[in-house]
Amino acid sequence: MFVWGLFCILRIALKPDRKYAVRLISKTAISSSGRADDNQDCCMVRGSRPRWRSNFSKLF
């Protein structure tokens, strides 16, 4: 499971011209800029577990 997640992340990072990669990069830029009012934009909500599975299902 960990290897599959690492593979997916590397595949997205190495091909930034794809539509879902641009969407993922823009979401991380928005969430890291300090705007944490939208819980859907970031994969980590304060006090909870990471929501990798739901975010990855939106990509495909």
From Swiss-Prot:
GO terms for biological process: response to antibiotic. It comes from the Bacteria. The keyword Acetylation does not apply. Disulfide bonds: none annotated. Disruption phenotype: Increased susceptibility to sub-lethal concentrations of aminoglycoside antibiotics neomycin, kanamycin, streptomycin, spectinomycin and kasugamycin, but not non-aminoglycosides tetracycline, chloramphenicol or erythromycin. 10-fold increased transcription of gvcB. Controls the expression of small non-coding RNA GcvB, which represses the expression of many amino acid transporter proteins and uptake of aminoglycoside antibiotics in cells. Might be a transcriptional activator. An RNA (xtr) with a tRNA-like fold possibly derived from tRNA-Arg(UCG) is encoded entirely within the protein; xtr does not have the sequence corresponding to tRNA anticodon or variable arms. 10 synonymous codon changes in the xtr region of xtpA have the same phenotype as a deletion mutation, suggesting the mRNA secondary structure is important for function. Keywords: Antibiotic resistance, Transcription, Transcription regulation. Transmembrane segments: none annotated. It comes from Escherichia coli (strain K12). Coiled coil: none annotated. This is Putative transcriptional regulator XtpA. This is a leaderless mRNA.
